[in-house]
Amino acid sequence: MKKVEMFTDGACSGNPGPGGWGCILRYKNQEKELSGGESETTNNRMEMTAVIKGLQHLKESCYVLLSTDSKYVLDGVTKYMPLWLANDWRKSNKKPVLNVDLWKMLNQELEKHQVEWIWVKGHAGHPENERVDSLACQERDKFKS
C-alpha cells in the first residue's frame, strides 16, 4: 500500500462568503498541489472539501498521513462520525448533522483508504500548512469583488 502525505486547508471571507481550499499530496519525492473555491460557502465546508478532493485524487487505496489544522474535520471524523452513522446522520439532540452532504462524501472516501490524522497548529510556521493556506486564500480571493 502506497504511503501518501496529505496537507489540507480551507479559507473563507465572511463565513458564509467566498471561500477556497488547498491540498498538497506527496508520494516519495513527487508533489501535487490541488485547489479550488466557491463564491458562497463556509470555512468548514472548505476545510472538508480540501480533504475530500485530496482523497478523491488518489487512484488506488493508500495509507494517508493527513495533516490538517481543522479541529472541525478532525473531531468530526475521529469522535463524532461513528455516532452520526449509527444515528442516520443525526446528532445526539436528534438534529441533522450540518454539512451532511460533505460528511457523506468524506465517509465514502475514507472507506477506500487507511488514514492517520495529524493536527497541526494553523499559522504557526508549518511549511506545508502555510502553503495550503496560501493556495486556499488565492482561490478565495478569485471570488472577492
What residues fall within each predicted segment?
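A short, polar/acidic, helix/strand-boundary loop motif
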Residues: 28-46, 57
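Metal-dependent nuclease catalytic cores that hydrolyze phosphodiester bonds in DNA/RNA
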Residues: 145
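RNase H catalytic domain
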Residues: 8-18, 52-131, 135, 140-142
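Short beta-strand scaffold segments in enzyme catalytic cores
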Residues: 21-27
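Extreme N-terminal starter segment of soluble prokaryotic enzymes
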Residues: 2-5
